[in-house]
Amino acid sequence: MTRSEALFEQAKKTIPGGVNSPVRAFNGVGGSPLFIEKANGAYIYDADGKAYIDYVGSWGPMILGHNHPKIRAAVLAAVENGLSFGAPTELEVQMAEKVISMVPSIEQVRMVSSGTEATMSAIRLARGFTNRDKILKFEGCYHGHADCLLVKAGSGALTLGQPSSPGIPEDFAKHTLTAVYNDLDSVRTLFEQYPTEISCIIIEPVAGNMNCIPPIPGFLQGLRDICDEFGALMIIDEVMTGFRVSQSGAQGYYGVTPDLTTLGKVIGGGMPVGAFGGRKDVMQFIAPTGPVYQAGTLSGNPIAMSAGLAQMEALCEEGLYEELSAKTKRIAEGFKAAADKHGIPMAINYVGGMFGFFFTEQPEITRFDQVTQCNIEQFRIFYHGMLDEGVYLAPSAYEAGFLSMAHGEEEMRLTLEAADRVLASMKAAS
């Protein structure tokens, strides 16, 4: 028994399922999860001391790589002054100014402590601002675990094989409408059915919780136009894509302007941080300037703000996103080339620092229903083969992969050589 396996057995005695977030349990791929002891650059190290090239990156935040010296130094300096004050700090102001300078649609921003808090608060604000109850989301998209959002959710809930989570009253769920991602007709149909009841659309601009599905041309702008036509707000959930797809997020990359944006992951530099922001007239509707209540004991935590600011400043380096995109393209297209070489059907998607691969004969994956038709068993075999080779991918066929600036020539070469060996083995066994 490895030390990770022993720790997992120990953890299950005191922690539900042995983990603090379901996807970490490896239910989607089988076997026991790795328990991680440390990380540096492009590598994570398990409890047995084995190194892995990491394509999870703490599920997205580690865009510069693990244990980045500038972020570590910023955190250590901040700790010298105390851990939490429950009062305003200059760091919060600096973070707000940095976010606003990078995302043109955000005129004011409120810090919170998680992506779920950000989306939950943005939806409450949209409902309060429009005085409407219903929201519209998309099948396969994931926006955190708030009750109103776990309706035909993606990510871990998708692995459970349930359209929604138990414990959510029907009275909550009835206010959440679910459309088909990349299908404007399904959105318009719902708006025509409820023309004055929908407060907002919330969307992952690149769906990262049914693997990685970019928007088809015109889709995001089409949503913007429908919101304008029916008086609803458009919320772009950039918890995953914010500052990962481009310096101004997916909204900047695709040229669409939302009313509200939710952020997380990258803005925390690895610390627990979320944020929501947007039009000033909408944001002024939040307490204390407006009637919509929202609060948080640790919101704007100085340690988290220090880590986030250090990362955000580093992301302003010229040419960084072009380099990151090139790395991502190389890995995604390298996987596809290896699969083609060995006669194993595979489709790929990638944008910015995100990528996805699908074991399928479908030439292109753009919708949730296509994702559910992919070969999950082949993914599991590939996953464990890569893990044995020292490459750590997301332990679910429904999660995106992430590159970092720390992934260099050596790491990419080793990864693609490993993929070639694993795919060759899969073909030989078929």
UniProtKB/Swiss-Prot annotation:
Q: What is its main location?
A: cytoplasm
In alphabetical order, the GO MF annotations are: glutamate-1-semialdehyde 2,1-aminomutase activity; pyridoxal phosphate binding; transaminase activity
Q: Which CDD domains does the UniProt record give?
A: OAT_like (cd00610)
Q: Where does this one sit in the cell?
A: Cytoplasm
> What's an example Gene Ontology biological process for this entry?
protoporphyrinogen IX biosynthetic process
The UniProt subunit note reads as follows: Homodimer.
Cellular compartments per GO CC? cytoplasm
Protein's organism: Shewanella baltica (strain OS195)
Q: Which InterPro entries is this protein grouped with?
A: 4pyrrol_synth_GluAld_NH2Trfase, Aminotrans_3, Aminotrans_3_PPA_site, PyrdxlP-dep_Trfase, PyrdxlP-dep_Trfase_major, PyrdxlP-dep_Trfase_small
Q: Which EC numbers characterise this protein's activity in its record?
A: 5.4.3.8
Question: What family does the database annotate?
Answer: Belongs to the class-III pyridoxal-phosphate-dependent aminotransferase family. HemL subfamily.
What pathway is this protein said to act in by its record? Answer: Porphyrin-containing compound metabolism; protoporphyrin-IX biosynthesis; 5-aminolevulinate from L-glutamyl-tRNA(Glu): step 2/2
By what name is this protein known? Glutamate-1-semialdehyde 2,1-aminomutase
